[in-house]
Amino acid sequence: MIKKIAVLTSGGDAPGMNAAIRGVVRSALSEGLEVYGIYEGYYGLYHNKIQQLTRYSVSDIINRGGTFLGSARFPEFKDPAVREKCVEILRSHGIDALVVIGGDGSYMGAKLLTEEHDFPCVGIPGTIDNDVAGTDYTIGYQTALETAVEAIDRLRDTSSSHKRISIVEIMGRHCSDLTISAAIAGGCEYIVASEIEFNREELIKQIERAIIKGKRHAIIAITELLCDVNELAREIEARVKHETRATILGHIQRGGTPCAFDRILGSRMGVYAVDLLLQGKGGYCVGIQNEQLVHHDIIDAINNMRREFKADWLAMSKRLD
């Protein structure tokens, strides 16, 4: 029977993680469990940065961005000897199970602890990229979306005033959910998504045709890592003879007060993760599909399940141009 659980946040931070931590802590305490917080993710676990938490430890954090437990990259966790030491540390505290909040890399760590050491872990999807399989939404995505849309709205104001083309680079790595959704909500004229081949020449020709028709300004939304957006801006300006500037939103998308959706989602997922552990269901990850909380085998979430590209959304955006 589980008596003590721990919780950590790993990888890139996301608004709403604190709500998930709070959900884990308070729901576990309500069931008579002891709860421990692991500071700075897997790095902190390896260095024994573990502290018992009370309900007051998570007071007044639901409205705060980031994660009060902190997070860190820890590539050394790939070493089996490092993982073995981490399990030894957990067991030295009498901890029976672990809740991991993060993205696919964090899930991989939880998967290895479960597979190699039969240590019960449950994953909660926390990343602004919305790129975790087995869930419609990840914690932090909606807040990051609002941040990106606000930035696009501001860029439109100044682009309109100066007859300028603006390129806005949006986070997401290999998943363009954030880019496509922000572009539709912000009324962007062009979308460059990571899931489809980037045809630079076709993009420039589209802009040229629009300018010939009298368009005064435009906004191009592009997913990060596809190209050097500043270089692209210079090329567009040289070709179409229209002032063009690039804006990289960067880590501003990860910060800020979490929206109500992410606070509620984090709370629900935190409680659900504890319920799974109480039912003896380690090795799973939490998700939300069609507004219902669900769980999947964490191995399937990593190896077999793939998020569907929003191709229909992208097609719709072209009809709205």
UniProtKB/Swiss-Prot annotation:
Q: Which UniProt keywords apply?
A: Allosteric enzyme, ATP-binding, Cytoplasm, Glycolysis, Kinase, Magnesium, Metal-binding, Nucleotide-binding, Transferase
Residue numbers binding substrate: 127-129, 164, 171-173, 224, 245, 251-254
Localization of this protein: Cytoplasm
Q: What is its EC number?
A: 2.7.1.11
At which positions is ATP bound? 12, 73-74, 103-106
Q: What cofactor is this protein dependent on?
A: Mg(2+)
A single cellular component GO annotation: 6-phosphofructokinase complex
* Role noted for this protein: Catalyzes the phosphorylation of D-fructose 6-phosphate to fructose 1,6-bisphosphate by ATP, the first committing step of glycolysis.
**What is this protein's name?**
ATP-dependent 6-phosphofructokinase
Source organism per UniProt? Histophilus somni (strain 2336) (Haemophilus somnus)
